């Protein structure tokens, strides 16, 4: 699409438009002699060893320099968002750019921005180049995107191309970057259905900023102008630091202290900086993703520094590991500090992958410094800019210790898994590697090592971790929705918010379609936010129609009627009656959900986040993120804190707030229940007598007006739903009393059976258990003796078939006793086949028998097992089985 890239600054300063003689891109420059666009691979990284700013900057200094510059130029600084984007979005897991903070609500024009124009320094996580980190000198998984953004409406236009380019140019100038070295490449950006022209801002071979002007929506192959025109800029803070120091790699510029510490610990010798610089320089001249196993990169560098490739490998490999470790641990500091709990799904999977990849790099170096210490160093470096991360240090350290132990156990257990797989497969392909990593946590390098010990080769793609990360980042949850008929009526007036205790109401029927009645107003709560729908009746005259379900879509509430007939007509005035006893239970349990969530955060830590809920009449469940099983003591503490909140009878208020105001005041923790659409949010607040927040959430559910109305809360049990997610099941009010009484009934019944007082149950049960174990031991000894006696009874019934002694016999024994008997008989070259009158069959062989018992049992009966022992079920008589056994052995 054609666009005019010429701006006021270019005219004023005499920029010229040129076409790059190497790549053919158009660009703007002050240097009339320049023939190339300035970007790699058309130009080399000429800043390495020759810093391009007036002074070297640290990461912290560059963040402050960036924020202060744009603040001085009329931009309001705003706080960073968490690196886990699913706190406010359901389409991506991680925050991948500064604009992601404002999507989708602000960029769609539904919500006004917190400030306009604004500036932000947003830490981001991108895993699409994870395999290149450490290898190329420039790739990072964790980086900070500086962004100055303007959201332009027709009636409130801030600035556009002229001002954006001028601001960027002046920022470069302020840093001391030579004006003639700066080029603005004309480009085009598309993403998320939007599009617009952009400039890539280059100096000395490296792109430092991108200036995007979002002004179109892409519809098929066409572009349509959008009313909200957005200035979306991205400045690479770490790249600015790198260019200001002239270090050979971006890692040496950002993580110098930690790199030096790890080099010392690993005993890695200093190598010529020219070698590191050449690797970075050559990597900048090629698309590393196309290099395959990076051999080409190695060969190019080896030629340039006159070192054999094998020697270069030995020199550079430890550096690549160190660089990957310092990058990954910075990412872990943010991911864990922002409350991500390692698990097998979503962002939990990605953080676990990063931990394990880091540990693998550390193992290759034989580092004595634990991962906890390296992340602690990162937290110390970040504490001035991000003090909130340091507040999570205890949690971060515990998580890392737990995950390290899990990783070590996985490696030990996994070797056997790989060996078994290789026995059944000729080779292990990419899908097998991914399955072993996803299901068993086995890094591909371990799989390769085990395979090598068995004489087999496994090929690992250089971009393995990128492939795995992309698969998990792109996984979408498909939630089943009730298909509702489309109707064209006004939105339904919701009475349950304004009048939360309304039990009856009058309304007019607007539409009747299928089994649904649509009213102009309703006090029936539609299913949503984890809370079940209200039920009750719609009454017309003396006729009652049962409401069995209520759903809401596009601001229209649908009332499903049981046995709907033509007595109800559109235009009728009817009365709605809520099943109030049911609603009251739902309200109590929903408020109890908020209370327990607050209690769990207080007892377990700020990493706790709601991962799902289901509010029903008799009980409710709350899924929370937590990295280990909740102990009995912790559970009692959660229950105690929850009931203290109830007894204190705290006020509960529900208010409608502007989205930005709510986020600014309460933070992203308001989205405990998931992503909430819209500009206006309903915020449910529980606060103590001093006005301190006990719990606050964006929630559309029905709630009590104070915590005392909830009544007694009883946590019935906990479950481990999946790794990293704990489920609490609980009841409130009379349902909680009923749950306690049911538990008491079980205790009383148990005490009656054991003929002891309930308070002595633990002691008596322990005694019975010890006695049972003793009796069990005696029974096993007797079974063993019976097996030995049976041996003498059956020893003379063996027949010789070829090289084997074979016994096929029916015995009076259960499967366990049959195994004892077979153990005594199946020695050396013996094959024992035992049957009983219950249809059980067992095949066992001696140590000198080559015939596989799992194959034998499949031939004579139905069953399975291992080569030396198999069990199953048979049909027919002993003679038929015996005939088949002999037939099978002779054929072998």
From Swiss-Prot:
Q: Which gene encodes it?
A: alaS
Q: What NCBIfam families does the entry give?
A: A-tRNA_syn_arch, alaS
Check the record and name the HAMAP family matching this protein: Ala_tRNA_synth_A
- Give the EC number(s) under which this enzyme is classified: 6.1.1.7
Which GO BP terms apply?
alanyl-tRNA aminoacylation
Quote the record's cofactor note. Binds 1 zinc ion per subunit.
In which organism is this protein found? Methanocaldococcus jannaschii (strain ATCC 43067 / DSM 2661 / JAL-1 / JCM 10045 / NBRC 100440) (Methanococcus jannaschii)
Q: Which CDD domains match?
A: AlaRS_core (cd00673)
From the Swiss-Prot or TrEMBL record, state where the protein is found.
Cytoplasm
Residue numbers binding Zn(2+): 590, 594, 699, 703
The cofactor(s) it depends on are:
Zn(2+)
Instruction: Provide the domain comment.
Output: Consists of three domains; the N-terminal catalytic domain, the editing domain and the C-terminal C-Ala domain. The editing domain removes incorrectly charged amino acids, while the C-Ala domain, along with tRNA(Ala), serves as a bridge to cooperatively bring together the editing and aminoacylation centers thus stimulating deacylation of misacylated tRNAs.
Q: Name the chain's protein.
A: Alanine--tRNA ligase
Q: Which cysteine pairs are covalently linked by disulfides here?
A: none
In terms of SUPFAM superfamilies, this protein maps to:
Class II aaRS and biotin synthetases (SSF55681), Putative anticodon-binding domain of alanyl-tRNA synthetase (AlaRS) (SSF101353), ThrRS/AlaRS common domain (SSF55186), Translation proteins (SSF50447)
GO terms assigned for molecular function: alanine-tRNA ligase activity; aminoacyl-tRNA deacylase activity; ATP binding; tRNA binding; zinc ion binding
